[in-house]
């Protein structure tokens, strides 16, 4: 319901905006037809909805639509139905029904009061509803009286509008049903009624109106109304039989109520039979009847207030009320013993009856409103009513029920009514009332326990006095004087000895009442009447001697003095001061020893309290100043007088005055000019405070032992101990005094009396001592004591011996200074009294430094004063550190205090005295190091940059030396300040600097701007080594530096030599910001001028308006006419930003410059309105701010994020008040990216980079569609964003726990136990930067402001460690991003994390070695428990250390890997490249990793493949916990081994449950080593079947070879099933089966196996064909026939002469017809054949057959079918193509690996397919020519050819071609290294039309080479001289292009090494194929060796560099080209 209530209030504020919400709520209300049903029943939701609508209307009835109002009115009209229980929901309690009625009617009545129109609508239904409640219809038997009563009770509290015509009817019914519906009246009662009616000249419409009480007929006879009041005037002035004794006399007055003919008096009630009958009649009334009467009276009162009723009916109401009031006195005079009922029953009855009387009194008062003011009858009725009310009030005072709350409320109502009548009528009623009121007041004051009655009397008196003061002053004066004179009347107890104790309570209460009246009415005339009487009593009367009366009068006069009336104030202060000094003068006298206790109370409590009361109440500035002077003078007099007294009189008399002094000094500004006389009084006060030890201790350390005192003088010894205790504690006096001293310190000016001669003369200081005092100047031991105390107070900074030249009084004086200046900082951190804002001028250092400025100080004194400054600073730091855990307003005050001190110290650096400047710099440096947040506070930076000019005293401007010294000092400090701030938070620092540049520019002060520019021009920030800072500074984190570049606004991309010039970018960005601010200001002016608004709202000038905007606040609020301008621009910017978001979500590209401009303008608009008070567009600005924070996150591109960081920095720099809002929105947006899986949190597999792209060939898992956009862009955006957040963390970590908690929320959500990060390798740096932020955040647990979150931070730290380890749960990958210096930044990011982690570990080990554990709480030393992060654990502390060590090792390795990737050709070795780790440590690492996550252990083994210890331990762990690893395919090699297969291990039983692995891994299990184990085979086939057949087709040669070992025909079964799923798979398989039909020369032992293999091939082929469906068979027939015909052309051409062969090809091609449009190229199934170019046939040269090249017209199967392209193919007959297929398979895998790693390397694995025995189809590489062909047309080498083809060296086309040649050469270099292709003559090297190299013809690979394997080509790849000319223009391997080539080779080789097993498995499966490449040596073993798995990444990089160097222009390469030229004529 609370949420619904909040929603209602929001809707009520803006019903138009939330009209849909309102309509929805109205729809939840019960509908009209429902309410009109015969027996409606509502639900709880109905009732809540009705209340909600009613509440909304009550808030804003004029703006709510009619639908809502009609809903409420319809429900109101249906309320009669609610009187039935069936109307309400089931089990709906009565309390809730009452609550509903009350809430509903309160909303309804409120709305009706606010809107007369709505009230009229409500009034139409109110009468009928009330009538139904009063008198339910006789036919409604289901009605529940309790419900209707609950409604009437609620109605009596909240009565809505009614119609005029309903008034009489309702009152008549109420009287009939609830008041007059009784037994018939007796004849006597009838006569009484008639008599009353005749007396008032009225006649009742009722039959027989009777008393409001239910009297049985004939039981009670009452006097007629005519007899009750004989004369109203005489009644009001007559005497009462009762009397109140007052000071020996009596005040006698008679109440009219006593004239009622009850016939009893005080004390005789129980014996009088008439009274007993009266009580009996009261008891006869039921409680229900009383409740009904109360309801009726209250309702009638409401009706009388709403409408005008019939006069006769009104008379009847008045009569009924009168009879109630008449009976009230009798009721109140009853005693408990008169009642038969007792206990709770009686209490309930009395409460009910009193409530009836209260309602009747209010009804009586309301009934008088309609009377004519001047009518005779009216006056008589008014007097009569006053008499009745006063009589009733008097009866309340004497009633035994007086203490009951109901009686007190009745008394209050009576007096309120009396006051209301008297004030309204005035004249005689007022005068008569004041006569009667005085005895009533005295009677109340005479009561021993007045309770609330005295408060009621006080309120009534105030109302009457204030209202009658101007109308009729005389009776008011008489009333006041009568009360005041009553306190002077002598009492009757003179004969008693101890008369002071017998002061009547009435006197004390009257005094208090009169004082309260004075304070309340605030009239000097009243004070002048009363105060003289009080003072006279105090000086001459009974109160002149100690007594309770005197104490009360002193309190009263002090309260009167607070009113600030000059005369009364001065008289009072003089009296109290004289009284206080008189007490001091009597100390030690005989009289003081026998004085009354009240005398002590007066001195200790009353007078000090009075002084404090005056100090608190005085408001007039002049009087406060006078009172301050008087109080300080009193303290000085008291101190001097008490100093000569024995004992502790100084403490006793000065101490009680301190709270008053503190209060009167609370508003005194100590920095203003103070008169010397007042300053001396302050000095005297502190002198005595120090002397008497009244100040709180200022030293926390134990006081040193006393050495200089002697036992020979006891008093001196005691005094020395007291002095030392005063310094070191404990405090011996009242704690309130200590607090008062602290407050006094805040308002005390520096105790520097003279600017010329600082220390006062000895005589003047000695005058503070009494000449005869034991503390006189001549007592050297006393002086020694004071010096010792001073030394202690200074913390031992000044030795006692160095103070010998300081006299005793000077030591006391310096001790007073020390107390004062240190206490300033103890109390509130050193903020002085003054203006509300905390600024440098309010820093207490402004006082401390005053002592240092005085010339001619002696060395000893100067040393002491300097020590005081340092002690004050230490105290300030301690105060700030103690409050570091505060939050909210307290934290804000603490920060403002820090900044105020920093600003003052900055400004003090311009002081003329060098000593002061040095101290300022020293303290400022300490403060900055302790509280780094000052670095980024705007006021501190303002002071730094501009104070050197602002604070230059005009008198010394002409001193060049001083000016130069100060400027030099400022420049040094500013430079250091800015460099440090940039090193921690470069974003925020730059934002602030840009802000200050704008500010300096607007000031138009050339010197200021020049100095700032000269300072900034020398400062640069950048990544890498920086001489400005070292260690782990935030600026060393690449993400932060990238964000800093964005924040600078320079739009820079991080480059290798990234170096951000602070000045240049700052000026540019400041100019941009100023321009945007100017645009907004200009638009505003133009808009206002066009709109005809007042010109006064226009800013006075561009510069001034701009300055206000940049500083973040306007000096004056925007005028209302600006609201429409703001609304228009807000709507525009919101619309534009939403459009950008929509564009991004639809996949469109957001235009960078437009987005940046829009965001900047929106930010300028937002900032321009910050200082305004207008709340019109708050929601709009909130929405705009939210969009500015969220848009970059939505768009998620680096450009958008750069813009975001720029504007966020602008916002937080120019508007610190928005920082929390901005950060909260950014954290929400960050969490949104987690929920929506974006960027860094794109945890879906398809965003994981290489792992996803290599599926399923080299990585396990189903292949998925690639992401729509490059995930790296979003990762880079997150990286920039994270840099900004780290920057903000550094700024807020020390001063804002709230913002830290926001970051903590972000980190907690980011480190959920369920992995939510992307696996993309390009995210490594960003990921570890986030983890670094997390660890930095957790290190805050040692900070005071995060102590209470310590346990939570420890858990978060564990989550961060687990998340960090989670990064290593997958195999390491590489990724190359086409962003300058990105890889270097990634490596550096991990290195910084490693650095932080290693430092944390070293700190941990150091603390452990010292026996001081770093952690506390219940999270350490836990054994055998479940940890929320780590799960089951044995020992938390030990396990945590092991996990940290593991993480550090893995991160070191990752940093090394990334460093190699970033700097592949670097010759340096990483410090982590060769970790010296023992085998035991490796084993422990493996165990720890496995305990966290088994995948981490597998990753460790993968990262260190040559480490036997790790492999052995991981193997054991996998096999031991194998059941838990079923989802991890990478674990397969650790239990599916040839050994386990041989032993048929039980571990293999897990394979049916194991997750699918990659295809290459599955292929490995098909090799003979695994012996075709059934479980292994079943797993392999399940894996293959889990992938689409099209994906498996790539490995068709390997699958065909696996048939050799397929004894169980399992592979064959898979192949047949796959052919059913894919026709293309079937066709490719058939072609490969046909290609294997090769007659090999049998070798020993192999003939049987090969024969069996050859035998099965045609069988499988036939089974496939037999399994074809008709359509599939048709497709198969057409496809194969078509290409068989093309292939057969070669046989036709063979007999023909060469010159006729081309024509023959054309003839044969013309014979071939296309059979369908679904034929495809066998080498590229995705290309559909659309025809043959018959004139394209070319016969090729060949020794045996006639290969032909034919060009087809093809289209892309999945592309545009109208886009027909040529594709040439070579059809070979007589050549075995299978070896080319294998080589190109490896090249294809390498290409995929390179692409997955983002490497810019080029390979072209053209298509080759064997279609039969020694037959095949080979795709022609398009747009290429061989190097030999190029040589046939050009004489020069490649370098010259490239210039001819692509233009001169240096041209764009040439360099592009060179780049293409480079990337292709590097790609084939890696492929050549692995495959070892030979016969690399220029005929086998192709170049395409853009300069790329392509290798063809792989007849010699692996271990084979031409010339009988002579291995003449010894280089790993061909890099001839002409190739080096292109790759290395320098010729000495020093050029940039050569380094690029080598770098790409290294990266390609490193990427290939990651997939070594997959490549080797692919080749190994072909081992038995009979291919020539396997004919000699150990091809598989040597292939593995070329990967060098035993090498680290850096070693592998060095190896590849060596390979490149070795191949560089190797002579064997040139020699082979020469041989080929000589033998084959191939151009070299």
From Swiss-Prot:
Residues 231-241 have a biased composition (Low complexity). Signal peptide: none annotated. Residues 1660-1773 are annotated as: Pleckstrin homology (PH) domain conferring phosphoinositide binding specificity. GO terms for molecular function: 1-phosphatidylinositol 4-kinase activity; actin filament binding; lipid kinase activity; phosphatidic acid binding; phosphatidylinositol-4,5-bisphosphate binding; phosphatidylinositol-4-phosphate binding. Its EC number is 2.7.1.67. Residues 1876-1884 are annotated as: Catalytic loop. Residues 1740-1746 are annotated as: G-loop. It is found in: Membrane; Cytoplasm, Perinuclear region. Pfam families: PI3_PI4_kinase (PF00454), PI3Ka (PF00613), PI4K_N (PF19274). Disruption phenotype: Lethal. Interacts in vitro with actin filaments via its PH domain. This is Phosphatidylinositol 4-kinase alpha 1.
């Amino acid at each position: 319901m609370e949420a619904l209530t909040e929603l209602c209030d929001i809707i009520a504020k803006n019903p138009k905006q939330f009209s849909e919400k309102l309509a929805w709520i109205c729809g939840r209300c019960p509908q009209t037809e429902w309410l009109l049903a015969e027996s409606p029943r509502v639900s709880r939701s109905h009732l809540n909805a009705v209340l909600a609508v009613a509440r909304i209307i009550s808030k804003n009835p004029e703006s709510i639509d009619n639908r809502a109002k009609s809903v409420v009115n319809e429900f109101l009209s249906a309320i009669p139905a609610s009187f039935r229980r069936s109307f309400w929901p089931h089990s709906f309690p009565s309390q809730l029904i009452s609550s509903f009625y009350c809430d509903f009617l309160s909303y309804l009545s409120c709305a009706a009061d606010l809107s007369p129109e709505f009230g009229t609508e409500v009034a139409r239904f109110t009468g009928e509803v009330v009538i139904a409640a009063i008198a339910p219809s006789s036919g409604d038997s289901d009605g529940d009286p309790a419900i209707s009563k609950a409604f009437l009770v609620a109605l009596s509290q909240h009565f809505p509008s009614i119609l005029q015509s309903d008034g009489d009817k309702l009152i008549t019914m109420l009287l009939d049903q609830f008041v007059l519906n009784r037994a018939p009246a007796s004849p006597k009662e009838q006569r009484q009624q008639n008599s009353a009616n005749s007396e008032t000249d009225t006649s009742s419409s009722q039959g027989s109106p009777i008393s409001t009480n239910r009297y049985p007929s004939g039981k009670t006879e009452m006097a007629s109304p005519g007899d009750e009041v004989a004369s109203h005037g005489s009644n009001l002035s007559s005497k009462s039989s009762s009397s109140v004794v007052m000071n020996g006399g009596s005040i006698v007055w008679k109440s009219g109520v006593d004239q009622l003919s009850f016939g009893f008096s005080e004390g005789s009630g129980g014996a009088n039979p008439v009274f007993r009958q009266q009580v009996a009649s009261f008891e006869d009334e039921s409680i229900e009847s009383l409740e009904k009467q109360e309801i009726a009276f209250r309702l009638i009162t409401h009706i009388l207030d709403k409408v005008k009723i019939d006069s006769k009916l009104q008379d009847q109401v008045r009569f009924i009320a009168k009879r109630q009031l008449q009976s009230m006195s009798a009721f109140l005079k009853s005693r408990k013993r008169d009642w038969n009922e007792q206990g709770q029953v009686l209490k309930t009855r009395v409460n009910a009856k009193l409530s009836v009387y209260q309602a009747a009194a209010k009804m009586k008062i309301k009934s008088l409103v309609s009377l004519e003011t001047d009518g005779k009858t009216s006056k008589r009725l008014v007097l009569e009513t006053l008499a009745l009310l006063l009589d009733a009030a008097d009866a309340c005072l004497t009633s035994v029920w007086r203490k009951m709350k109901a009686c007190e409320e009745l008394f209050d109502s009576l007096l309120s009514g009396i006051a209301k009548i008297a004030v309204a009528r005035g004249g005689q009623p007022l005068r008569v009332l004041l006569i009667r009121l005085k005895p009533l007041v005295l009677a109340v004051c005479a009561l021993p326990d007045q309770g609330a009655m005295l408060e009621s009397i006080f309120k009534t008196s105030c109302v009457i006095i204030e209202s009658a003061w101007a109308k009729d002053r005389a009776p008011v004066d008489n009333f006041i004087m009568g009360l005041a004179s009553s306190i002077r009347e002598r009492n009757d107890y003179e004969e008693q000895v101890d008369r002071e104790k017998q002061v009547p309570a009435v006197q004390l209460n009257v005094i208090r009442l009169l004082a309260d009246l004075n304070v309340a009415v605030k009239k000097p005339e009243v004070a002048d009447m009363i105060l003289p009487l009080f003072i006279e009593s105090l000086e001459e009367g009974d109160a002149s001697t100690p007594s309770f009366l005197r104490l009360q009068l002193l309190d009263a006069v002090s309260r009167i003095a607070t009113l600030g009336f000059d005369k009364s104030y001065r008289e009072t202060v003089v009296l109290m001061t004289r009284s206080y000094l008189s007490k001091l003068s009597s100390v030690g006298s005989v009289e003081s020893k026998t004085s009354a206790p009240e005398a002590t109370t007066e001195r200790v409590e009353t007078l000090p309290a009075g002084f404090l009361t005056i100090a608190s109440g005085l408001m007039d500035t002049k009087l406060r100043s006078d009172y301050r002077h008087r109080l300080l003078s009193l303290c000085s007099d008291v101190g001097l007088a008490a100093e000569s007294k024995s004992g502790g009189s100084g403490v006793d008399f000065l101490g009680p005055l301190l709270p008053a002094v503190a209060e009167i000094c609370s508003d005194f500004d100590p920095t203003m000019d103070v008169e010397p006389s007042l300053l001396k009084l302050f000095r005297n006060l502190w002198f005595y405070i120090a002397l008497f030890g009244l100040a709180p201790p200022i030293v926390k350390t134990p006081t040193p032992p006393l050495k200089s005192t002697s036992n020979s003088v006891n008093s001196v010894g005691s005094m020395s101990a007291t002095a030392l205790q005063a310094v070191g504690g404990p405090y011996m006096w009242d704690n309130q005094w200590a607090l008062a001293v602290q407050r006094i310190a805040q308002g005390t000016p520096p105790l520097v009396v003279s600017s010329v001669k600082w220390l006062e003369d000895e005589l003047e200081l000695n005058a503070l001592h009494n000449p005869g005092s034991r503390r006189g100047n001549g007592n050297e031991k006393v002086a020694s004591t004071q010096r010792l105390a001073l030394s202690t107070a200074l913390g031992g900074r000044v030795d006692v011996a160095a103070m010998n030249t300081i006299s005793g009084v000077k030591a006391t004086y310096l001790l007073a200074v020390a107390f004062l200046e240190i206490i300033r900082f103890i109390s509130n951190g050193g903020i002085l009294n003054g203006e509300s804002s905390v600024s440098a001028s309010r820093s207490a250092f402004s006082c401390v430094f005053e002592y240092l400025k005085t010339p001619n100080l002696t060395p000893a004194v100067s040393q002491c004063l300097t020590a005081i400054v340092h002690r004050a600073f230490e105290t300030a730091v301690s105060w700030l550190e103690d409050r570091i855990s505060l939050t909210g307003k307290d934290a804000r005050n603490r920060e403002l205090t820090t900044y105020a001190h920093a600003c003052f110290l900055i400004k003090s650096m311009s002081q003329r005295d060098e000593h002061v400047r040095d101290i300022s710099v020293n303290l400022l440096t300490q403060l900055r190091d302790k509280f780094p947040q000052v670095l980024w506070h705007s006021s501190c930076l303002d002071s730094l940059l501009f104070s050197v000019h602002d604070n230059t005293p005009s008198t010394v401007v002409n001193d060049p030396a001083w000016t130069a010294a100060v400027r030099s000092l400022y420049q040094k400090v500013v430079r250091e300040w800015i460099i440090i701030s940039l090193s921690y938070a470069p974003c925020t620092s730059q934002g602030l600097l840009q802000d200050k540049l704008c500010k300096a520019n607007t000031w138009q002060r050339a010197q200021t701007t020049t100095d700032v520019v000269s300072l900034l021009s020398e400062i640069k920030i950048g990544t890498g080594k920086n001489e400005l800072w070292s260690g782990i500074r935030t600026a060393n984190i690449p993400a932060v530096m990238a964000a800093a570049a964005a924040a600078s606004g320079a739009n820079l991309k991080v480059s290798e030599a990234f170096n951000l010039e602070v000045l240049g970018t700052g000026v540019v960005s400041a100019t941009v910001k100023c321009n945007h601010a100017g645009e907004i200001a200009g638009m505003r002016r133009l808009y206002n001028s066009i709109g005809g608004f007042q010109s006064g709202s226009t800013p006075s000038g561009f510069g001034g308006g701009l300055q206000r905007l940049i500083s973040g606040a306007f000096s004056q609020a925007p005028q209302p006419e600006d609201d429409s301008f703001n609304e228009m621009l807000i709507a525009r910017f919101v619309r534009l930003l939403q459009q950008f978001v929509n564009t991004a979500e639809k996949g469109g590209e957001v235009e960078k410059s437009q987005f940046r401009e829009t965001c900047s303008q929106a930010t300028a608009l937002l900032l321009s309105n910050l200082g305004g008070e207008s709340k019109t567009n708050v929601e709009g600005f909130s929405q705009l701010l939210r969009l500015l924070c969220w848009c970059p996150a939505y768009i998620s591109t680096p450009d958008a994020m750069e813009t975001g960081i720029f504007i966020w920095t602008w916002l937080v720099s120019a508007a610190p008040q928005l920082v929390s809002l901005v950060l909260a929105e950014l954290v929400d947006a960050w969490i949104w990216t987690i929920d929506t899986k974006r960027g860094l949190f794109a945890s879906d597999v398809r965003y994981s980079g290489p792992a996803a792209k290599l599926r399923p060939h080299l990585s396990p898992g189903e292949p998925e569609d690639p992401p729509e956009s490059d995930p790296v862009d979003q990762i880079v955006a997150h990286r920039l964003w994270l840099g900004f957040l780290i920057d903000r963390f550094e700024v807020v970590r020390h001063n804002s726990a709230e913002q830290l908690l926001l970051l903590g929320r972000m980190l907690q959500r980011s480190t959920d136990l369920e992995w939510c990060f992307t696996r993309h390798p390009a995210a490594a740096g960003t990921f570890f930067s986030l983890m670094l932020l997390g660890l930095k955040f957790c290190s805050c647990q040692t900070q005071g402001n995060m102590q209470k979150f310590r346990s939570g931070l420890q858990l978060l730290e564990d989550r961060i460690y687990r998340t960090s380890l989670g990064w290593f749960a997958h195999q390491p990958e590489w990724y190359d991003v086409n962003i300058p210096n990105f890889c270097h930044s990634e490596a550096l990011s991990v290195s910084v994390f490693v650095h932080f982690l290693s430092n944390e570990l070293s700190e941990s080990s150091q603390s452990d070695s010292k026996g001081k554990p770093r952690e506390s709480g219940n999270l350490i030393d836990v054994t055998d428990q479940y940890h929320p992060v780590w799960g089951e654990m044995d020992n938390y502390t030990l396990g945590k250390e092991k996990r940290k060590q593991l993480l550090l090792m893995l991160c070191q390795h990752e940093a090394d890997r990334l460093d190699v990737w970033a700097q592949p050709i670097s010759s340096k070795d990483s410090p982590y490249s060769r970790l010296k780790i023992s085998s035991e440590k490796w084993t422990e690492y493996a165990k720890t990793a496995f305990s966290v996550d088994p995948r981490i252990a597998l990753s460790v083994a993968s990262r260190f493949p040559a480490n036997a210890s790790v492999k052995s331990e991981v193997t054991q762990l996998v096999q031991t916990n194998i059941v838990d690893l079923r989802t991890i395919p990478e674990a397969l090699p650790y239990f599916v081994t040839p050994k386990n297969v041989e032993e048929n291990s039980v571990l293999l039983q897990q394979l049916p449950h194991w997750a699918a692995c990659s295809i290459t891994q599955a292929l490995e299990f098909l090799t003979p080593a695994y012996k075709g184990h059934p479980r292994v085979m079943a797993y392999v086939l399940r894996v293959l079947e889990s992938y689409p057949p099209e994906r498996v087709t790539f490995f068709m040669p390997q699958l065909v070879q696996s048939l050799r070992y397929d004894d169980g025909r399992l592979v064959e079964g898979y192949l047949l099933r796959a052919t059913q799923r894919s026709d293309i798979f079937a066709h490719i398989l058939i072609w490969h089966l046909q290609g294997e039909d090769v007659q090999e020369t049998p070798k020993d032992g192999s003939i049987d196996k090969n024969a069996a293999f050859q035998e099965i091939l045609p069988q499988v082929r036939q089974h496939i064909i037999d399994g074809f469906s008709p359509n599939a068979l048709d497709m198969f027939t057409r496809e194969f026939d078509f290409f068989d015909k093309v292939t057969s052309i070669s046989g036709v051409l063979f007999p023909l002469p060469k010159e006729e062969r081309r024509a023959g090809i054309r003839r044969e091609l013309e014979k071939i017809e296309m059979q369908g449009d679904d034929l495809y190229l066998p080498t590229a199934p995705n290309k559909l054949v659309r025809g043959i170019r018959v004139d394209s046939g070319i016969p090729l040269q060949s020794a045996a057959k006639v290969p032909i090249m034919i060009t087809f017209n093809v289209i892309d199967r999945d592309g545009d079918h109208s886009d027909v392209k040529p594709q040439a193919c070579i059809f070979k007959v007589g050549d075995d193509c299978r070896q080319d297929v294998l080589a190109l398979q490896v090249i294809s895998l390498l290409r995929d690996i390179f692409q997955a790693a983002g490497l810019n390397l080029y390979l072209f694995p053209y298509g080759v397919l064997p279609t039969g025995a020694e037959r095949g189809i080979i795709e022609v590489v398009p747009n290429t020519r061989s190097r030999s062909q190029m040589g046939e047309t050009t004489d020069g080498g490649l370098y010259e050819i490239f210039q001819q083809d692509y233009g001169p060296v240096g041209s764009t086309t040439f360099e592009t071609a060179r780049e293409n040649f480079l990337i292709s050469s590097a790609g084939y270099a890696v492929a050549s290294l692995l495959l070892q292709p030979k016969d690399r003559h220029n005929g086998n090297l192709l170049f395409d039309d853009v300069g790329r190299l392509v290798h063809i013809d792989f007849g010699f690979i692996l271990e084979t080479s031409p010339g009988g394997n002579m291995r003449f080509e010894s280089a790993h790849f061909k890099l001839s001289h002409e190739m080096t000319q292109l790759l290395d223009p320098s010729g000495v391997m020093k050029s940039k292009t050569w380094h690029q080539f080598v770098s790409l080779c290294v990266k390609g080789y490193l990427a290939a090494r990651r997939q070594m097993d997959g490549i080797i498995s692919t080749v190994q499966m072909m081992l038995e194929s009979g291919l020539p490449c396997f004919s000699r040596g150990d091809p598989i073993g040597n292939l593995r060796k070329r990967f060098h798995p035993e090498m680290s990444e850096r070693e592998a990089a060095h190896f590849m560099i060596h390979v490149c160097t070795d191949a560089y222009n190797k002579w064997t390469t040139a020699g082979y080209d020469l041989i080929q030229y000589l033998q084959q004529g191939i151009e070299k």
